[in-house]
Amino acid sequence: MRTVVLTMKASVIEMFLVLLVTGVHSNKETAKKIKRPKFTVPQINCDVKAGKIIDPEFIVKCPAGCQDPKYHVYGTDVYASYSSVCGAAVHSGVLDNSGGKILVRKVAGQSGYKGSYSNGVQSLSLPRWRESFIVLESKPKKGVTYPSALTYSSSKSPAAQAGETTKAYQRPPIPGTTAQPVTLMQLLAVTVAVATPTTLPRPSPSAASTTSIPRPQSVGHRSQEMDLWSTATYTSSQNRPRADPGIQRQDPSGAAFQKPVGADVSLGLVPKEELSTQSLEPVSLGDPNCKIDLSFLIDGSTSIGKRRFRIQKQLLADVAQALDIGPAGPLMGVVQYGDNPATHFNLKTHTNSRDLKTAIEKITQRGGLSNVGRAISFVTKNFFSKANGNRSGAPNVVVVMVDGWPTDKVEEASRLARESGINIFFITIEGAAENEKQYVVEPNFANKAVCRTNGFYSLHVQSWFGLHKTLQPLVKRVCDTDRLACSKTCLNSADIGFVIDGSSSVGTGNFRTVLQFVTNLTKEFEISDTDTRIGAVQYTYEQRLEFGFDKYSSKPDILNAIKRVGYWSGGTSTGAAINFALEQLFKKSKPNKRKLMILITDGRSYDDVRIPAMAAHLKGVITYAIGVAWAAQEELEVIATHPARDHSFFVDEFDNLHQYVPRIIQNICTEFNSQPRN
């Protein structure tokens, strides 16, 4: 009996030493792992939908090829969570079809999602959905920790198939949180439990929670194999270092002695943590009734002084607050000018009013002259680009603030800006006094710069201390998108109907050349259901509507439709074709669209063209007549809008048609831009 007891004591001592060495080694290993692990961006497939991912904000890497139409996207700028994450990224322009990293942020569900065609992806409409998301460039915020492994709402997620997810009862460790080493007293307690031959009753949860020994909160686990309870201890939540204040661990009290099914628990440290991610602060999507891309040109010249510069910044901050900045509404950037202009931040730098106001506060004055014309040229060439966050469906607006008067000319720079579709507003403060007017470089500069001279685009303030009074009228005007006339350009504001001669004299080969000419012209325009629309009619003795203005709303679809037009063959009744186009095409044109008819023929008409052409002119249809080979010059001049020299063209051979594309486009734009600005 004594021998047995000695043997048991020897075994206990041996086990104690093993556990002690193991605990020390574990402590060293734990100390080595305190360093935060390097963030690994999780990869997802093109078909992964945002709604399947539980994380409220995360960075992922998309593969190439997500432009494929089989990956459905719902919405524009703000997407329903039923959408493909990577498909939405391509649609928004954050990614191209080669893939890459993106930042995804969950936002509230919407009452409706509008479909649109953008960057090769056709998004679909959806009446409502419970959750939305926006896609941004993968620039992580300071102090925010993003998950290296995504949490999916289904066990059969793509990550699970790749072996990346954890079991249901496991949780990823909180960055910066480490478990304390097992203490000597705990090891002795376990050792005594092993050595004692009698069976001890299991502690109840209440007994565990009311122990008199002061120690950190603990979570108990039971080993199925050894029928032993081991305790994992953690640092107190008050002393635990945090990488992200937005992520907190739940208080483990009340969770003691949980028994995870199938968990292998070894002696010593058994970590079990519960994560609780605080709901993110609500992110405004912006006012959808004021979806504009706005650039403020602020005066940083030396003459303005520091005090007035601060007043100017205060107006900017107030505008940012009043506009309700967001991806579904207005976006705003700031350019400061002096001798030379410089961008402080572009349209996609700050996508909510709070961040924008903070950034405005940090702007410092540059000094120098007041070269406004140079600044307008800079904005026209550099600011409104896709890389800077410019959106195709949002009007481009520039608000120029001028103290006194510019030190350079603005007329030519402003004309180019208007022709590029930019709506220029001017706020002038404290104009030139009578004895200062001799120094003004360009008299009446504001009217030469603004989009229209009807007073809508100009605001004048007698004193800097009255600048705040411009806030409400300015916000109201820039958000009145129906009156932003300069958003309409020669390339985005027309309904263009091609009337194509398909008579026998043309021939199959030449007919394909004519279609290529139509394609080359179409490529020059901005195509969508709200921009330029294209329709086509083919005629011989009879007429055929190939497609109407409302048939296709994207450039690729239009170009494919032109390719599919089949050669008809027959006689040449040009007059009847004009009447048919007026009835079947232009009768369905939108009231706010310029109506352009481009007629191509290779011979004299069998019927009268004078009365149909006059009807077209009276209905406001601007008609271009292009004759090839045997076309009659006098007929072309009758068909064409006055002056005929700008609207009729004769080409000796079909193969030379392509040479006239630049000239026709130039004439269309010259005529558009010569409209009165009042």
Swiss-Prot record:
<dbReference type="GO" id="GO:0005614">
    <property type="term" value="C:interstitial matrix"/>
</dbReference>
<protein>
    <recommendedName>
        <fullName>Vitrin</fullName>
    </recommendedName>
</protein>
<dbReference type="InterPro" id="IPR036609">
    <property type="entry name" value="LCCL_sf"/>
</dbReference>
<feature type="disulfide bond">
    <location>
        <begin position="46"/>
        <end position="62"/>
    </location>
</feature>
<dbReference type="InterPro" id="IPR050525">
    <property type="entry name" value="ECM_Assembly_Org"/>
</dbReference>
<feature type="signal peptide">
    <location>
        <begin position="1"/>
        <end position="26"/>
    </location>
</feature>
<dbReference type="Pfam" id="PF00092">
    <property type="entry name" value="VWA"/>
</dbReference>
<dbReference type="Pfam" id="PF03815">
    <property type="entry name" value="LCCL"/>
</dbReference>
<dbReference type="GO" id="GO:0005539">
    <property type="term" value="F:glycosaminoglycan binding"/>
</dbReference>
<dbReference type="GO" id="GO:0005576">
    <property type="term" value="C:extracellular region"/>
</dbReference>
<feature type="compositionally biased region" description="Polar residues">
    <location>
        <begin position="230"/>
        <end position="240"/>
    </location>
</feature>
<dbReference type="GO" id="GO:0021510">
    <property type="term" value="P:spinal cord development"/>
</dbReference>
<keyword id="KW-0524">Neurogenesis</keyword>
<keyword id="KW-0325">Glycoprotein</keyword>
<feature type="compositionally biased region" description="Low complexity">
    <location>
        <begin position="199"/>
        <end position="216"/>
    </location>
</feature>
<comment type="subunit">
    <text>Binds dermatan sulfate and chondroitin sulfate.</text>
</comment>
<keyword id="KW-1015">Disulfide bond</keyword>
<feature type="glycosylation site" description="N-linked (GlcNAc...) asparagine">
    <location>
        <position position="390"/>
    </location>
</feature>
<feature type="compositionally biased region" description="Polar residues">
    <location>
        <begin position="154"/>
        <end position="168"/>
    </location>
</feature>
<feature type="domain" description="VWFA 2">
    <location>
        <begin position="495"/>
        <end position="668"/>
    </location>
</feature>
<feature type="domain" description="VWFA 1">
    <location>
        <begin position="293"/>
        <end position="478"/>
    </location>
</feature>
<dbReference type="InterPro" id="IPR002035">
    <property type="entry name" value="VWF_A"/>
</dbReference>
<feature type="region of interest" description="Disordered">
    <location>
        <begin position="154"/>
        <end position="177"/>
    </location>
</feature>
<feature type="disulfide bond">
    <location>
        <begin position="66"/>
        <end position="86"/>
    </location>
</feature>
<feature type="glycosylation site" description="N-linked (GlcNAc...) asparagine">
    <location>
        <position position="520"/>
    </location>
</feature>
<comment type="function">
    <text>Promotes matrix assembly and cell adhesiveness. Plays a role in spinal cord formation by regulating the proliferation and differentiation of neural stem cells.</text>
</comment>
<dbReference type="InterPro" id="IPR036465">
    <property type="entry name" value="vWFA_dom_sf"/>
</dbReference>
<dbReference type="GO" id="GO:0010811">
    <property type="term" value="P:positive regulation of cell-substrate adhesion"/>
</dbReference>
<keyword id="KW-0732">Signal</keyword>
<dbReference type="GO" id="GO:0030198">
    <property type="term" value="P:extracellular matrix organization"/>
</dbReference>
<keyword id="KW-0677">Repeat</keyword>
<feature type="region of interest" description="Disordered">
    <location>
        <begin position="199"/>
        <end position="257"/>
    </location>
</feature>
<feature type="domain" description="LCCL">
    <location>
        <begin position="40"/>
        <end position="133"/>
    </location>
</feature>
<keyword id="KW-0964">Secreted</keyword>
<keyword id="KW-0272">Extracellular matrix</keyword>
<dbReference type="InterPro" id="IPR004043">
    <property type="entry name" value="LCCL"/>
</dbReference>
